Amino acid sequence: YMDQVTTFMEEQLSSTKRYEDDKILTKTMINNYAKNNLLPPPNKKKYSKEHLLVLIFVYYFKNLLSIKDIEILLKPLTDKYFAVDSEFDMESIYEEVCKMEKSRIGELQDSIRKAYETAEHSFVCVDDEEREQLQKFAFICNLSFDVYVKKQLIEKMVDELPKPDK
């Protein structure tokens, strides 16, 4: 049921919150996701494991993409792999993506470390007092540029996907 879904998501994803009073998922969000074709309707008000997996994808995507872009990305998957009696389903997709992401953690850590080191070697001609703040700013700019470029690429790729039927 919806209350169980919001509680479960809050418990599982609370470590990703920036502020303690941030909400991971609300009933209104779930209703909006269903209304915007991101989430298939529940079966007699009951949500399945696959609903939770789709909600996890939505949770991560919504920080980068518009609701429309998320629909373009997820609708073909939910149409083809949601609640199917097949070995390959939403859970298979989720597991494969998680495995791929976990395999990249070291690479991402190295990339972040390199961005930090680059920033650490910037503003060497500035007084010590100001240098630390400017280096932190440079580090944030470096990370932001990385996110910006990747977001642009993601949006371009989404724009090239077929638009889902209503």
Which stretches of residues belong to each language-model region?
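Basic helix-turn-helix/winged-helix DNA-binding cores
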Residues: 1-81
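Intrinsically disordered, low-complexity, charge-dense segments enriched in Lys/Arg
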Residues: 80-166
